[in-house]
Structure formats: structure tokens, C-alpha cells
């Protein structure tokens, strides 16, 4: 792929939302940042364009992922789209030192990716789509070709069961993305009873850095979800770095601090 200095969109599937946007790219760049937006699995106002304010990150490829939304699709179809997008990036661009960052349910999907085979398999059982044969090639390619140097969790949802205990009104968007209580309970490692989720993480190595950010001014998510993620990673002996600060409301996505946070630094 030739260098890209002005943003371009590329399709990784047939649906209008199955696209990535490349904001800048050069095969000589030392690192690559790939962003997964949030929006409660359903909000069309959240898109890959949330990456645009961080163009000042130096010597880096910057890519955002769009994916299909609920209620048109249910979990784990959003996650499958992310895998397809990652495969497209690796097949078409010379990228290394990949940082994958996600905001809100984008962070949820980064957590899910750590056990994507099990999470997707369990999710499809609930939507009566048990045939995984069509996904075998996708799984194999991602497993063999995608290695993340850094993952960044940004004001995320990590346990939907606990989320609804704290915010019962959020059932409206959860119901759009899932078909039952068991479906969303099985959707992340923190609430699932599937013993296969004790397997080692996928797509990362012992050298992968885990960064967690939480704005103390977030008006939609308290620190509880972040504490739950911290407890989970600690139980797996996975090291991480936690950063908290007064960095704006949830939909401001760190506001004037976005570029600093998205680059993995501290405002």
C-alpha cells in the first residue's frame, strides 16, 4: 500500500458500516494505532472519526474501525467485524507495533478479543448461529498474524451484569445488543462461567502493555467498571498501568486531552 497523507476509507465487508478509515499511513512509521469507537453497540453518532483529533501523534499510522450496529445485529457480530477489520489491515498494510485502543464498548471488545474464540462461540449459541466453520479461516489468520504491542482501555464496560445492577436504565441498549440475560453474562470474561476463559490471552504476549484510563468526570460510567477490570487482570497476574484524571464527560472522549491519552501518555 502506498503512503496515505489524506484520510481514506476502505471496505472490509459488504455492509456500509464495515469500513476502516486510514487517517495517515507510511510503511516507514514505527507504530500503528487502531481505534474502536463506542456508542453502546448502537449509536451511529460514534464513529471512526473520533480518531481525527489525534493526527498529531508522530511517526504513527492512524486507523479507525467502523462496525455494524445493533439492533440490526447482536453480539458477537460486532466483535467478528473487528476481527475482519484487523485481518484487512494486516493483509493490506505494512504495520507493526500495533496499539489497539477502544472507548466505552470499544474497550469491551478489546477485553473480548483476549479470548475471542470462546467469546464468539458462546455468543453465537445464543443467537442460534452455531456453525463456526465459516469463521475458521478468520480465526486462524488473526491468530497467526495479529500481535498487539499495547492495548488501551478507555472508560470501558467490562461486566454487563454489574453494569445493569448499577444502571438499570441501561437495559434499553443492552437489550438491543443481546437476546437474553445469559447472552450478555457470557459476553465477557468477568461475568461468564465458561471455564475455557481461563486459557491464556490471545493476540498479546508477555511484553504487551496494558493501559487503563478513566475520566473521573465521566457522567455515564463510574469507576466501578474500571475497578472490575483491574480486579480481573490482577487475578490473571496481568500487569497494567492505570491512569485517572479530570478529563471530561463520557461523550467528550477526553476532550482536549484526547491526543495525549490516545497516544498512551498522561495529561
Curated annotation (Swiss-Prot):
Q: What is its EC number?
A: 3.5.1.9
Copy the pathway line from the protein's UniProt record.
Answer: Amino-acid degradation; L-tryptophan degradation via kynurenine pathway; L-kynurenine from L-tryptophan: step 2/2
The record's section on SUPFAM superfamilies has:
alpha/beta-Hydrolases
Q: One Pfam family of this protein, by short name?
A: BD-FAE
Keyword Hydrolase on entry: yes
Its BP terms in the Gene Ontology are: 'de novo' NAD biosynthetic process from L-tryptophan; L-tryptophan catabolic process to kynurenine
Q: From which residue to which does the signal peptide run?
A: none
Task: Provide the alphabetized UniProt keywords.
Answer: Hydrolase, Tryptophan catabolism
Please list the residues that make up the active site: 104, 218, 250
Under the heading Gene3D superfamilies, the entry gives:
alpha/beta hydrolase
Would you say which domain of life the source belongs to? Eukaryota
Q: Indicate the family of this protein.
A: Belongs to the kynurenine formamidase family.
What is this protein's record name?
Kynurenine formamidase
**Which source organism does the UniProt entry give?**
Candida albicans (strain SC5314 / ATCC MYA-2876) (Yeast)
